[in-house]
Amino acid sequence: MIDLFQKIDFTSHAGLDLTWKIEMDALTPNEWECIAHMIMEHSVPFREAIGIPRGGLLLGKILNRYGTGRIDHPICIVDDVLTTGGSMNEFYRKRHWRNPTQYIGWVVFSRNKPPDWVNTLFQMPITDI
């Protein structure tokens, strides 16, 4: 069994040296379904969900089942863990350039303050350290 929270030195996708990790591969399919359900209790309706590779792909697939398909609803971009927000913003910019429409974002865990357009299910304390 893999631990969800791991005390380990590693380099994040953003290139930061971190001392603990949230290992989302530890979650079971039922836990991912529950996370999607929790997000839907707080989300505005969205047209479709798109997961950021690699961490957001499964969540995007599950949340896409809740998509309305309505052109007047935003597209939902999702990821598992947000550290700096760089991946979310970059994915948004690329998608918006190809498909200029309204977008919302959801992440399961946020290690820092997310961009204004991104919602967080579980927010870690924000510090200036």
Can you say where each PLM-predicted feature lies in the sequence?
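PRPP-associated nucleotide enzymes
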Residues: M1-I129
